[in-house]
Amino acid sequence: MFLQNAWYAVAWCDEVTDGIVTRKVLGRELALFRDGEGQPRAILNRCPHRFAPLSLGKRIGDAIQCPYHGLHFGPDGRCVHNPHGDGVVPDVATPTFPARERHKLIWAWMGDPALATDDIAGGEYGYLDDVELDLLPRGHLHLDCDYRLVIDNLMDPAHVAVLHDSALASEALIRAVPRVWREEDVIRVESWAPDSKPSFLFGAWLGNHDDPVDHWVASRWQAAGLLSVEGGVVAVGGDREDGLRVRGAHMITPETETSAHYFWAVVRNFREDDAEQSEQIRATTAAIFTGEDKWMLEAIERSMDGEEFWSLRPAILGTDRAAVMVRRALESEIKAEGRPKVVAVSAG
């Protein structure tokens, strides 16, 4: 089940330069490239003549030359040159998808182009714009699991205490009762642990593992797979804005029904210009996501063995409320998208 009319992250901006990048999104393989003005373009990676992957071809000016028979396709997907015979250009095109460059990422809109919005996630990822690209801890992870399992994971503060016990766990956060609420099309969950010891990573960043702090973790979801997760600590009784904070952007893009792309980046409000600190955060985050989250989510996918999530009748804990709300909201949006539109006709 995929939401078509939504923006999906498909590449980091510096991945798409002079060549052609391929990425499968919602079961369709895209060819990503930049036109002569440097704007990102996304077309179906399939020549409409004999179905050769266009990504195996060459860039010639604004066009891509098919590697099989040499037809040229422009940024709008239309054939613009036929090298054979009388040179008559066939009236054919490969499908195109709206593409944007925002917040250091390339995004593609997989649904109706007329419905593509100008903004992405309501500008939520604007905090990525304030960090130089070479100082931004970031990555792209491929997972062999349903994309909704990844979203469940990010909206579930309870798993941190067990799966990430060595780096992120906090005894007080384990006992905290998450607050869950909805603001229009955004669902949020937050856990608050006052007067408690920091997790290992926050203790390391503070340089103090023993003194109590007020600790929090908060997640935000917006369709289809756009999430932010913030963790922070502040002196007991202090203002959260004065605390030490780390904020993660998590963009989940379905590849197929059982695989996904996970784009992530982390910003912080301490030692922001320290390249060594950035690399330490990148390496630590990548190790956690790869060695713990990816490992677990792919194991869950295998364990489910192709069964539909709700058909397995999962036990629901109190800490699952946010993840369940998101699943229901996403299911509702997908169903609404598939319904025929009702057009009112006035009586004549």
From Swiss-Prot:
PANTHER family: 3-KETOSTEROID-9-ALPHA-MONOOXYGENASE, OXYGENASE COMPONENT, IRON-SULFUR DOMAIN CONTAINING PROTEIN
Native source organism of the sequence: Rhizorhabdus wittichii (strain DC-6 / KACC 16600) (Sphingomonas wittichii)
SUPFAM superfamilies reported in the protein's UniProt record: Bet v1-like (SSF55961), ISP domain (SSF50022)
Site (Plays a role in the stabilization the metal coordination) location in chain: N153
GO terms assigned for molecular function: 2 iron, 2 sulfur cluster binding; metal ion binding; oxidoreductase activity
Binding site for [2Fe-2S] cluster: C47, H49, C66, H69
Function, in words: Component of the chloroacetanilide N-alkylformylase multicomponent enzyme system involved in the degradation of chloroacetanilide herbicides (N-alkoxyalkyl-N-chloroacetyl-substituted aniline derivatives). In vitro, catalyzes the N-dealkylation of butachlor, alachlor and acetochlor to yield 2-chloro-N-(2,6-diethylphenyl)acetamide (CDEPA) (for alachlor and butachlor) and 2-chloro-N-(2-methyl-6-ethylphenyl)acetamide (CMEPA) (for acetochlor).
Summary of temperature dependence: Optimum temperature is 35 degrees Celsius.
Domain Rieske: residue ranges: 7-108
Regulation: Activity enhanced by Fe(2+) and Mg(2+) ions. Divalent cations such as Ca(2+), Cr(2+), Co(2+), and Mn(2+) show moderate inhibition of the enzyme, whereas heavy metal ions such as Ag(+), Cu(2+), Pb(2+), Hg(2+), Ni(2+) and Zn(2+) severely inhibit the activity.
pH profile: Optimum pH is 7.
Domain of life: Bacteria
Keywords assigned by UniProt, alphabetized: 2Fe-2S, Aromatic hydrocarbons catabolism, Iron, Iron-sulfur, Metal-binding, Oxidoreductase, Plasmid
Cofactor dependency: [2Fe-2S] cluster
Residues annotated as binding Fe cation: H159, H164, D293
Any one GO biological process: catabolic process
Subunit field text: The chloroacetanilide N-alkylformylase multicomponent enzyme system is composed of an oxygenase component (CndA) and an electron transfer component formed by a ferredoxin reductase (CndC1) and a ferredoxin (CndB1). In vitro, chloroacetanilide N-alkylformylase assays in which CndB1 is substituted for CndB2 demonstrate that the two enzymes possess nearly identical activities.
EC assignment: 1.14.15.23
InterPro entries xref list: Cholesterol_7-desaturase (IPR050584), Rieske_2Fe-2S (IPR017941), Rieske_2Fe-2S_sf (IPR036922), VanA_C_cat (IPR044043)
Entries under Pfam families matching the protein: Rieske (PF00355), VanA_C (PF19112)
Name this protein carries in UniProt: Chloroacetanilide N-alkylformylase, oxygenase component
